[in-house]
């Protein structure tokens, strides 16, 4: 689990996302509260439930990007799902309980990686011995007379192996043969049953080994994984993963506005209000049956987000509104924000294009007025047509760089300066003509 302070979390998000300080502060506090809760006494810890968040804002302002970056910072089981992928129980489509099953799978993977790190040294030693055994088979006769000589030779080869001198040499080793995969086609909504059937068939076959010939470098990696998996206790792994999900799990529900009931619709709405009703027990706290064991959702943090352009938060059913107590509104982006997005974040769009063209030997220089013009063009198109936020910059930049990208391989060693005049020549007609903007930008 991350032990970063709220200020450190916001600072880290600032290097990738421009503006939206209120949203950053809310998710930073929520993430830090996960750590604070774990410092409490066990009886009080059970009573402290997470304060779920609802992020509201137009498309392309950073809601999903905040989730992506948060996943890397959290160091905890994290899953991002689209609310529109689910339907009410009993209908064709995914059930919402699949969210928790996927989150548990994520925790299993995370826990396994942590346990492999802990036993990596022992696994490396065991893998090294197996490679040396393959290189220097033990003599069948006169074992006592050759013992000292064999040991000395083994140490010489061990030194060469560690220095990488034997990386390209091929050896034959016995490795665990992968279990025969059995693909079972299932209708939507029955993924859990399919997974359990596949696991059952895979566990029925004995773990046979297979002799393979490969370079030592490749064999060493394979043997480390094999030896590490032998050192891991699978039951302990499942227990730790379930504990991790229950205490630190985070679910990001994107596009939650798309499951709001529309005023004009009538009859059963299985992919809208039905999904909201099914989400209620998950968010409130229930027990979900997964193939790894029972998972309680009482302390899982839910962060929901939506543009709410065709609906409003009050269109959610009241019970779900009450379970998302923290509301954060994200601001629409201005031309000034677009300029900052082009230059300030780590691996910004301008940096990416400079690096891409650099692979062809072409040097690109963006001037201050050139960046201003790009930002202004993107903002104008957003104002005149659909406002898709920062995503418009990708479209505008791709259009701007199209000619240069096509001819770059023939212009090695050249220097191109992208200033206001260059931007005007490339984009002016498209920006001014609303019909062209609507279809091309």
Curated annotation (Swiss-Prot):
Q: What is its main location?
A: cytoplasm
List the GO biological process terms. protein unfolding; proteolysis involved in protein catabolic process
Pfam families the UniProt entry points to: AAA (PF00004), AAA_2 (PF07724)
Gene3D superfamilies attached here? 1.10.8.60, P-loop containing nucleotide triphosphate hydrolases (3.40.50.300)
GO cellular component annotations, sorted alphabetically? HslUV protease complex
Going by the entry's taxonomy, the superkingdom of the source organism is recorded as Bacteria
What are the binding positions for ATP in this chain?
A: 18, 60-65, 254, 319, 391
Subcellular location(s) per record: Cytoplasm
Q: InterPro entries from the entry? A: AAA+_ATPase, ATP-dep_Clp_protease_ClpX, ATPase_AAA_core, Clp_ATPase_C, HslU, P-loop_NTPase
Keyword terms of this UniProt record: ATP-binding, Chaperone, Cytoplasm, Nucleotide-binding, Stress response
MF terms from GO for this chain are: ATP binding; ATP hydrolysis activity; peptidase activity; proteasome-activating activity
Instruction: Summarize the subunit comment.
Output: A double ring-shaped homohexamer of HslV is capped on each side by a ring-shaped HslU homohexamer. The assembly of the HslU/HslV complex is dependent on binding of ATP.
Record-stated family: Belongs to the ClpX chaperone family. HslU subfamily.
Function comment: ATPase subunit of a proteasome-like degradation complex; this subunit has chaperone activity. The binding of ATP and its subsequent hydrolysis by HslU are essential for unfolding of protein substrates subsequently hydrolyzed by HslV. HslU recognizes the N-terminal part of its protein substrates and unfolds these before they are guided to HslV for hydrolysis.
Check the record and name the HAMAP family matching this protein.
Answer: HslU (MF_00249)
Protein name, UniProt field: ATP-dependent protease ATPase subunit HslU
What is the source species? Shewanella halifaxensis (strain HAW-EB4)
Lineage at the top is:
Bacteria, Pseudomonadati, Pseudomonadota, Gammaproteobacteria, Alteromonadales
